[in-house]
């Protein structure tokens, strides 16, 4: 099977889905101890890089999403689908998995 090359800028989420670039995990503890990859906690914060058109309502209209491209968001720990593109980590989430917008 041939590998498919996908450019991040071409990803277009469907419905109420949001494509988020995951912030890097902390590599050191507060005391300065380096953590191995398997001991690092999965980050729950990232930057929105693409949003879907919104959830379709019963009347056929779409509900606008509360977040937009460029927003930093906090999301549920085990939510979404993890995606790796061009060596970077991303997660595809439903809007309901977003807990907060972070300034």
Curated annotation (Swiss-Prot):
Q: Does the keyword Cytoplasm apply?
A: yes
Entry GO terms, CC: cytoplasm
Pfam families, alphabetically?
Cpn10
Please list the GO terms describing molecular function: ATP binding; metal ion binding; protein folding chaperone; protein-folding chaperone binding; unfolded protein binding
Name the predominant localization: cytoplasm
Q: Where in the cell is it found?
A: Cytoplasm
Entry-linked InterPro entries:
Chaperonin_GroES, Chaperonin_GroES_sf, Chaprnonin_Cpn10_CS, GroES-like_sf
PROSITE patterns recorded for this chain? Answer: CHAPERONINS_CPN10
Provide one Gene Ontology biological process annotation. chaperone cofactor-dependent protein refolding
**Which keywords appear in this protein's UniProt record, sorted alphabetically?**
Chaperone, Cytoplasm
Q: Which NCBIfam families match?
A: PRK00364.1-2 (NF001527), PRK00364.1-6 (NF001530), PRK00364.2-2 (NF001531), PRK00364.2-4 (NF001533), PRK00364.2-5 (NF001534)
* Quaternary context: Heptamer of 7 subunits arranged in a ring. Interacts with the chaperonin GroEL.
What's its job?
Answer: Together with the chaperonin GroEL, plays an essential role in assisting protein folding. The GroEL-GroES system forms a nano-cage that allows encapsulation of the non-native substrate proteins and provides a physical environment optimized to promote and accelerate protein folding. GroES binds to the apical surface of the GroEL ring, thereby capping the opening of the GroEL channel.
Q: Which family does it belong to?
A: Belongs to the GroES chaperonin family.
Q: What is this protein called?
A: Co-chaperonin GroES
Source species, please? Crocosphaera subtropica (strain ATCC 51142 / BH68)
Q: What is the lineage of its organism?
A: Bacteria, Bacillati, Cyanobacteriota, Cyanophyceae, Oscillatoriophycideae
């Amino acid at each position: 099977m041939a590998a498919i090359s996908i450019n991040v800028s071409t990803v277009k989420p469907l419905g109420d889905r949001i494509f988020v670039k995951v912030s890097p995990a902390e590599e050191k503890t507060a005391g300065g101890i380096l953590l191995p990859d398997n001991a690092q906690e999965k980050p729950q914060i990232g930057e929105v890089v693409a949003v879907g058109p919104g959830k379709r309502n019963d009347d056929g209209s779409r509900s606008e999403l509360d977040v937009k491209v460029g927003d930093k968001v906090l999301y549920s720990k085990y939510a979404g689908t993890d995606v790796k593109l061009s060596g970077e980590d991303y997660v595809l989430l439903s809007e309901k998995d977003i807990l907060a917008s972070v300034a």
